[in-house]
UniProtKB/Swiss-Prot annotation:
It comes from Methylococcus capsulatus (strain ATCC 33009 / NCIMB 11132 / Bath). Pathway: tRNA modification; tRNA-queuosine biosynthesis. Substrate binds at residues 56-58, 75-76. Catalyzes the NADPH-dependent reduction of 7-cyano-7-deazaguanine (preQ0) to 7-aminomethyl-7-deazaguanine (preQ1). It is an enzyme of class 1 (oxidoreductase). The lineage of its organism: Bacteria, Pseudomonadati, Pseudomonadota, Gammaproteobacteria, Methylococcales. It catalyses: 7-aminomethyl-7-carbaguanine + 2 NADP(+) = 7-cyano-7-deazaguanine + 2 NADPH + 3 H(+). GO terms for molecular function: preQ1 synthase activity. Belongs to the GTP cyclohydrolase I family. QueF type 1 subfamily. It is found in: Cytoplasm. Pfam families: QueF (PF14489). The keyword NADP applies. This is NADPH-dependent 7-cyano-7-deazaguanine reductase.
Length: 129
């Protein structure tokens, strides 16, 4: 049975909830439709998050991202929708979604949206020589 687009996101238990660590996922084939022209918009989505109790399952993420391909959406709105949906299902300590849209009319658009759990403070990064 072939895979179908889906708005259903799945998670799995974080194997190391006692550690702060960052998961970075790059999705180079995001598409949606321009709500003004109906033309396709293409973007690379970068998802960065510090999981708490749940991690995002990758196949469901792929099908979720694929579900936008026939939907009209402004760049700002779709980026924040993706963030909101991912935060709702996974409840991370921190999450950032960066959407780098391909050029349209001579203009590149990058939208960055992030959320932080109110009780989470990041550790200080180590500065290596």
């Amino acid at each position: 049975m072939p895979s179908q687009p889906s708005k259903t996101l799945e998670t799995f238990d974080n194997p190391r909830p006692d550690h702060d660590y960052t998961i970075r996922i790059e999705i180079p084939e995001f598409t949606c439709l321009c709500p003004k022209t109906g033309q396709p918009d293409f973007a690379t989505i970068l998802l960065e998050y510090v999981p708490d109790r749940q991690c995002i399952e990758l196949k469901s993420l792929k099908m979720y991202i694929w579900s936008f391909r026939d939907e009209g959406a402004f760049h700002e709105a779709v980026t924040n929708t993706i963030l909101d949906d991912l935060v709702t299902v996974s409840r991370p300590r921190f999450m950032r979604v960066t959407a780098r849209f391909n050029v349209r009319g001579g203009i590149y658009t990058t939208v960055v949206a992030e959320r932080r759990a109110p009780d989470w403070e990041p550790t200080t990064p180590v500065a290596l020589p």
